[in-house]
Each structure stands twice: as structure tokens, then as C-alpha cells.
Regions:
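Core transmembrane alpha-helical segments of multi-pass membrane transporters/permeases
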Residues: 145, 150, 160-172, 183, ...
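Hydrophobic transmembrane alpha-helices
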Residues: 215-218, 253-254, 295-300, 443, ...
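Conserved, well-structured core domains of diverse proteins
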Residues: 1-127, 133-137, 634, 638
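Low-complexity, proline/glycine-enriched hydrophobic segments characteristic of transmembrane helices
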Residues: 516-519, 642-682
Length: 682
């Protein structure tokens, strides 16, 4: 099985490698550009520019260089269509894309001085050549084509719709119409400003995300990915349904540093899925367990697919606050997934792996202790010392490179061969990190088009009116509409771009319409809500790209794999609905340690009971009425106030005109619900 697993891994890696069609000089050029990009990002994050007073970059120019690298590499590694080779035309487009970005770097001061007025060059007596309009237009078009090649059509279609809406706003339905932006204003705002394509999302990509992806690539090339997987098998391989539990644990550990549930599925699934199949899981269930665990890896602090840093910037809170609130739902969701794998093993009467196939726990743990040092450095600096994410990940990356050097020197008796291996591993890590960032960086930049369109047209305000008109005071309809939009908008996007798109459109809407309906939703709860359901798009058929990746490895049916993964992920889907109403699940309003323990215990019990209900199994198969009882118990445990309010309402509602006849207790809370007419008189 080990040989088979290695063959599968090699085949999948070959199929998904961005450089699979490259050879000779072309491959060397791509590798060189990728390595230079990684070095630039390390320099930008380091304290050296300030120490030497050299090579300092302002925000917008740094973002432009970042996207310039991504666009250049995109056209050098992704052909115009599958089966084609990179042509001279592709190389030309990559140069034009790079120039469109570098123009911002070279002429940044002039752009600031002109305050948004685009430069035109007068030719002859009267003809004006709108040079910046042309550069910006080329930049946007090239970005969209790069997105089509690297990510796919869905995000391109969404971005084009928002661009058309920005320009033709006056022709839109009255409820969302606006005056429309001129072509100059549209291109200038989208390409030459730092509110759209070069806005907060790509700023976070420059500051943090690239380095996290680079950290993951360096860890993988040093052998960290294999170590975590071996450790997972050593810990749980002998348990009932051990390979499934190992897949969950391994995906959780690699998901801590991975920026994509699809990449996570491929990385760990090439090892775990064949072994799950061998021990008795069906093709679809093996793939679905891997998909569910990989998606769960993206909601796990401290990194959360790098979306945690964007979330902190969007909400205006510290990174630590985001991690603190996201911690409990992620942990109990993961424990519930372990429970699912156990229930499946009970259903199928599966045993654990044979002793001979399971690595020795002590030897395995000790063999890779050095991999834990840079991860400890990262978490210690982020969570305990509360340093910035860019500062923390820079020093974690440097510590990883140095720790790997020391390990190889000791392992190879301080020989020159050790230095050679270390240098090669580091260079390959730099190359892989940059190539892995191409799709992520481009997706985030294109998501910036949507952010810019929402900001420049007032669309979020109009969306509030539209959804309020549809949902009225019915919070169920409001949440249903939000979930559907998140699933549609999150199709096929990397985790961070996914969050940027759904949060920019839906977060404000959910807060405002929720308030109008009499519900006060904390901002962090709303952002985590849209983040969770945006991620569910990776699982949910018919798109569910992570399910397709798992099916490619397992040989199963992609649609059946997706449906099974969706069913497994119901526990992840219920949590954001619960924590919108029960804020204690996000550790909001916790008064002391005992209060926290009660919340953690009841939440964990609730999600496990809910999982049993959805899987129809406890110690044995549940009858239909037992499933209903389990669901009621789970809701009571997850949201006690919701159930108590049905029997003992927290508030005694009175009409305003009767308020004078009510004797108010000065020690009790009073809430006023204020309604306002919609633009349509409702």
C-alpha cells in the first residue's frame, strides 16, 4: 500500500503541478522569477529595510509589485487552454501585465499628486492619448484572463458583472441603481487606487498570506507534511477506523498552515484515501472524510486559511480577538468529525490498522521534533507575545530555515552534502511557495474588483434594502438568503478570496437587516458566519471542487463524494447558525472559568448529539423518533436560551401605546424595538 500511495501521490502532484508542462530554459526562468518573488516578500517583511534605510516600499507600490509577480508567473505557467503550450503571445501578455503593475510603483508619487485624475499625453495640436486609462484597462483585462486560467470562469463572471454594474448603474433595476461611473473613474478607482484591486485584501496578501504559504511550502519540502501524517497514523492508526481518524488529524495539522481546502485535500488525501479504502471504506466515503477534514482545517486557528488576518483588518479588531472567538466552534466541529469517522467504523464493523503498518509513536514523534520549533515560534509570537502577523511569520520562517539547516548538519555529520541538501530544499521551498501563491494572489486581486464595486456604487446599502424587502422581519428567510448567496459566491475560490467576496457583500447586510428584525448580531459572529458558509461551497455539489479533487484520488463518483461530504459537514453548517444567536459559543460574555467550562461541555455534548442524529447512529442504528429526540436535545444543549424562550420568554412584549399601563422593574432590562418604513412603504 505504501508503494501504491507513493505512485498515486506522484501522479496527482504531476497533474496538479503548475510547472508540469515546462522544460529547459522556460522552467528555469519560471523558477528564477518565483524565487525572486519569495526573496522580495521576505525582504519586505523583515526589519532590514529599516536597519539599512534601503529598499523600503510604501503600501500601494508593494501591492503592485506583488500582483506584478503573480500576473507574470500566471501567463508563464498556465496556457490559454488545457493541452496547449505556453506561446510567445502568453509571454507578451505577461510582460504587459507586469508593466501595468510596475507603472504604479514607478509613478506612485505622481499618482498621489494628481489625486485620481488620470494622465493623458497630448499628441500634435489636439489629440489626447489617455495613457493611464489604457494602462489601467489593460491591467484589469489581463487580471481577468489570468483569473480565468488560474482559477476558472465563475470568479471572472462575477467580477465582470460587478464592473458592468459599476459602469451601467443607471440602467440597473431601480432598487439597486446608481448614477454610474465614468470609464476614467471606473478604471482609475479599480486599478490606480488602493480601495479596489489594490485594496485591503491584497494588502493582507502582501503582508501575511504570502509568508504563510511560503512557510507551508518550506515545511513541506523539509519533510514536515509527511511527518505530521506519520504522526497522525502513529497516534490513531490502531483505533477502530484508524485511517479515517488519521486523515482527520493529519488534515487538521497541515490545514493549520494551508491556504486552500482543495490543496489540503490533495496533499493529505494522496496518502490517506487509498489506506481508508483498503481498510473497508467505500471510495465515496473515503473521499468525503478527507474533504470534510480538509475544509475543517481552514476554520482552525491560528491561521484559518489566512482569512483570520483579513477578518481582523475588515472588522478592525486584533488578530488575537478573531482567534479567541473562532477557537471553540472549530475545535468542537473537529471533535465531531472524529466522532463521525468512529460512527462510520461502527456501521461498517471496521477494525484499526495492523500493528505492522502503524509507525511507532515515540520514534515518529521524536524524529520530527525540530518541525515543531518554528510552529511553536509562530504561535508563541502571535498568541502570547501578541506581535503582528507579518513580524511573527517572518521570524517563524527564518527559524524554520535555520532549524532545518541545523537538523541536516547533525544528521549528515556536518558534511558538505548537508549544506547542499539544505540549499536545494530551501530553493525548492521558495519556488513552490511562490507558485502556490499565484492562484491565491490573483483570486484575491480579482475579489478586490468586487470590494471596489461595492464601495464605489453604494451596493451594500441597496442590498440591505432588497434583502430587507424580501425577508421583512423573518430572520429565517434572511439567514437562508445569506447562506445561498455565500454558497454561490464562494464557488471554487481559495479560502481567503472566498472570505473577501462573501464578507464584502453579505456581512454588512446581515448585521443591518438582523438589527432591523430585532436581532443584535456581533460583527465577529457575522463575519465567521459568512466565512463558514463560503467554505461550504468547496463541499457542496454541483461545484464542490474539493470533492472533485478527492474523487480523482479515490476513483469514486464526484457527485456522490460531494453529497456524502456535505452530509458529514452538516455539523459545521449548524454551528454558525447557532453562534449567531448563542454568542457564548464564541466565548462572548463569558464571566469566569466555570462559566467557560459549562459552555465548552454543553457545546461539545450538543454537537456530538447532533452528529449522531444526522448520521442516524449512536450505539446502534437510531429509529426515526430517536433522531427527532436527539435533534431536540442537541438544540437544547447548543442554544439553551432558544429553547427556554419557548417556555419562559426572556422578554414580555408590549405594544408601545400600552407602555404606560405596565409597571417596569428598575432592576430588569428593557428593550425597545424600533421599526422604520422601507422605501416601498412596508
Amino acid at each position: 500500500s505504501q508503494i501504491f500511495s507513493e505512485k498515486v501521490k506522484d501522479k496527482i502532484n504531476e497533474d496538479l503541478s503548475p510547472t508540469k508542462n515546462l522544460t529547459g530554459l522556460h522552467l528555469k526562468i519560471v523558477a528564477a522569477i518565483a524565487i525572486i518573488w519569495s526573496l522580495f516578500q521576505l525582504w519586505y517583511a523583515s526589519p532590514f529595510p529599516f536597519i539599512f534605510n534601503f529598499g523600503m516600499f510604501k503600501g500601494l507600490p508593494a501591492r503592485a509589485i506583488h500582483l506584478g509577480f503573480a500576473l507574470t508567473l500566471a501567463f508563464l505557467i498556465y496556457p490559454i487552454s488545457k493541452g496547449k503550450k505556453i506561446s510567445v503571445f502568453d509571454i507578451l501578455i505577461s510582460f504587459i501585465g507586469a508593466f501595468s503593475c510596475l507603472y504604479i510603483y514607478f509613478f506612485y508619487d505622481q499618482l498621489v499628486d494628481r489625486g485620481g485624475v488620470l494622465l493623458s499625453i497630448v499628441i500634435g495640436d489636439s489629440f489626447k492619448l489617455p495613457i493611464e486609462l489604457i494602462i489601467g484597462s489593460f491591467g484589469i483585462i489581463i487580471l481577468l484572463e489570468a483569473t480565468r486560467r488560474a482559477i476558472g470562469l465563475p470568479l471572472v463572471i462575477i467580477a465582470v458583472c460587478f464592473l458592468l454594474f459599476s459602469y451601467f448603474g443607471r440602467y440597473a433595476p431601480e432598487i439597486i441603481s446608481h448614477g454610474g461611473l465614468s470609464l476614467n473613474r471606473l478604471v482609475g478607482f479599480q486599478w490606480l487606487d488602493q480601495e479596489a484591486i489594490f485594496g485591503i485584501p491584497i494588502g493582507v496578501s502582501v503582508d501575511f498570506i504570502f509568508l504563510f504559504v511560503l512557510f507551508g511550502a518550506l515545511l513541506e519540502t523539509a519533510g514536515g507534511g509527511k511527518y505530521f501524517l506519520d504522526l497522525a497514523f502513529a497516534m490513531v492508526g490502531k483505533m477502530r477506523g484508524g485511517p479515517a481518524k488519521a486523515a482527520i488529524l493529519g488534515s487538521g495539522m497541515t490545514g493549520l498552515i494551508s491556504g486552500s481546502s482543495i490543496a489540503n485535500t490533495v496533499t493529505t488525501g494522496t496518502f490517506t484515501i487509498p489506506i481508508m479504502k483498503k481498510t473497508g471504506f467505500s471510495k465515496e466515503k473515503a473521499g468525503a472524510i478527507e474533504v470534510s477534514s480538509s475544509v475543517n482545517g481552514q476554520i482552525m486557528p491560528p491561521v484559518m486559511g489566512a482569512a483570520a488576518f483579513v477578518m481582523a483588518s475588515f472588522i478592525g479588531v486584533t488578530y488575537f480577538e478573531v482567534v479567541k472567538h473562532a477557537f471553540l466552534p472549530a475545535i468542537i466541529s473537529y471533535i465531531a468529525l472524529f466522532y463521525i469517522s468512529h460512527l462510520e467504523a461502527l456501521k461498517l464493523n471496521l477494525k484499526g490498522m495492523d500493528d505492522v503498518d502503524v509507525p511507532n509513536l515515540k520514534k515518529t514523534f521524536v524524529s520530527g521534533l525540530h518541525f515543531l520549533i518554528p510552529i511553536f515560534v509562530l504561535i508563541y509570537m502571535l498568541v502570547y507575545l501578541r506581535f503582528t502577523a507579518s513580524y511573527s511569520i517572518f521570524y517563524a520562517t527564518v527559524s524554520l530555515i535555520l532549524v532545518n539547516l541545523v537538523h541536516l548538519l547533525i544528521k549528515n555529520s556536518f558534511s558538505k552534502e548537508a549544506l547542499k541538501i539544505w540549499f536545494n530544499q530551501t530553493i525548492v521551498g521558495f519556488e513552490k511557495g511562490a507558485l502556490n501563491m499565484v492562484g491565491v494572489g490573483i483570486a484575491i486581486a480579482t475579489a478586490g474588483i468586487i470590494v471596489g464595486a461595492v464601495g464605489s456604487t453604494g451596493l451594500s446599502t441597496n442590498l440591505i434594502i432588497v434583502i430587507e424587502s424580501i425577508a421583512k422581519d423573518n430572520v429565517t428567510i434572511l439567514l437562508f438568503l445569506t447562506i445561498i448567496l455565500c454558497l454561490l459566491l464562494g464557488m471554487g475560490l481559495p479560502t481567503t478570496a472566498n472570505y473577501v467576496v462573501v464578507a464584502s457583500l453579505m456581512a454588512t447586510v446581515l448585521v443591518d437587516v438582523g438589527n432591523a428584525s430585532g436581532f443584535i448580531f456581533p460583527l465577529i459572529a457575522v463575519h465567521l458566519f459568512v466565512f463558514y458558509f463560503g467554505l461550504m461551497a468547496d463541499v457542496t455539489p454541483p461545484v464542490g471542487l474539493a470533492s472533485y479533487a478527492a474523487a480523482a484520488i479515490s476513483g469514486g463518483d464526484p457527485l456522490k463524494t460531494g453529497l456524502q461530504a456535505f452530509w458529514y459537514s452538516l455539523r459545521t453548517g449548524i454551528l454558525p447558525i447557532v453562534f449567531l444567536f448563542n454568542h457564548e459559543l464564541l466565548l462572548i460574555g463569558i464571566e469566569n472559568i466555570w462559566h467557560a467550562l459549562i459552555v465548552i461541555t454543553t457545546s461539545l455534548a450538543g454537537i456530538l448529539v447532533f452528529t449522531s442524529a444526522t448520521q442516524g447512529w449512536f450505539f446502534n442504528k437510531l429509529k426515526w423518533y430517536e433522531i427527532i429526540i436527539f435533534l431536540i436535545i442537541s438544540i437544547s444543549l447548543l442554544s439553551p436560551e432558544f429553547v427556554l424562550n419557548k417556555f419562559y420568554p426572556k422578554y414580555n412584549y408590549q405594544e408601545t401605546n400600552k407602555i404606560n399601563s405596565v409597571v417596569l422593574n428598575p432592576k430588569k432590562e428593557v428593550r425597545f424595538k424600533i421599526t422604520r418604513p422601507s422605501p416601498y412603504g412596508e
